[in-house]
Amino acid sequence: MVTNVATALIGVGDMWIVGQLGDAPTQGAVDIGAKLFAALFTVMNFLKTGTTGLVAQAGTRVGQHAQAQVLVKGVVVGLAIAAMLLLAKPVLLPLMLDALGAEARVRTAAVVYADIRYWSAPAVLVNFALIGFLVGRRRMREVLAIEIFYNLLNIALGLWLALGLDWGIAGIGWSSFIAEFAKLAATGALIWYLAGNDLRAALADRANISLRALKPFLAINRDLFLRTVVLMVAIAMLTRLGAERGAVTLAANGIVYQLFVLAALLLDGFENAAQVLNGERAGDGDRAGFTALVRAILWRCLGVAILLSAAFAWAGGMITDSFAATPAVAA
């Protein structure tokens, strides 16, 4: 759960840094960019969730070599999708910005931010698979350490580039880009240290990256992909409605959205637990244990959701004031 909160902080950090610039259109541009990449990358989150569940199952059924095979498949799929996204960038990025419908000044700033962050696609998608592998092997402390490093680096670079060097919104984009590849390097090095021998064997077996071997991996993630697409379409529609009402409304909605993401990822910690623990039970064929665990996690998730709602009702005003670029945005 704590790990997922750390994941959310990169978007929160970007919104806080741009708030210090004191310009509502620029803050609105970062909001548009953040949601654009949420739509673009989050629909690929099946690389993480699918890898987590399959790695957990493989650990009980076969062993570490099978877990390495799952990781190789996840990385191959991630790189393939990233390559397609980069090839489609000249067409896809303008279309997505048009769909969000921002006014001219906001769009100009959003193009600067989005054009830089878009190139981090390979790192983001491969990181999904790498983090899923670590979660599936219950390496949560290591994941938490990586996420904290990632977020602190992003915030430090953002402050230095955007405010210290006066790069503005471009500095925020570059800080996120650098942080993503630094996270990839750190996560990759850790996994190679933990499972280098198994990974070498899995990479040497070309059958692991054949289309036939990848089909089951893709099939099991189909429903996750479709669910996330529907969610991202809804968020994009809300962003467009905010953009049509001007930069101040867009910036205000962006702050609320980051709090929503923070809460969602906190609750998503229960999903991570379910993926690992139920993956192990599925691997053992323990149907009764599987059902009991699902019920227990749902009740705990409901309790945390109620507590979060109460916290936002009590302190929501103070939180939004600290992020707002201008008093009008806070209001």
Language-model region placement:
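Residue-level signature of transmembrane alpha-helical cores of multipass secondary-active transporters
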Residues: 1-4, 38, 78, 117, ...
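N-terminal transmembrane alpha-helices
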Residues: 1-16, 20-21, 35-50, 54, ...
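Short membrane-interface helical motifs at transmembrane helix boundaries
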Residues: 84-115, 307-331
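Membrane-interface helix-loop junctions in multi-pass transport and translocation proteins
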Residues: 151-185, 189, 316-318, 331
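Interhelical loop/hinge segments that connect adjacent transmembrane helices in multipass membrane
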Residues: 176, 188-231
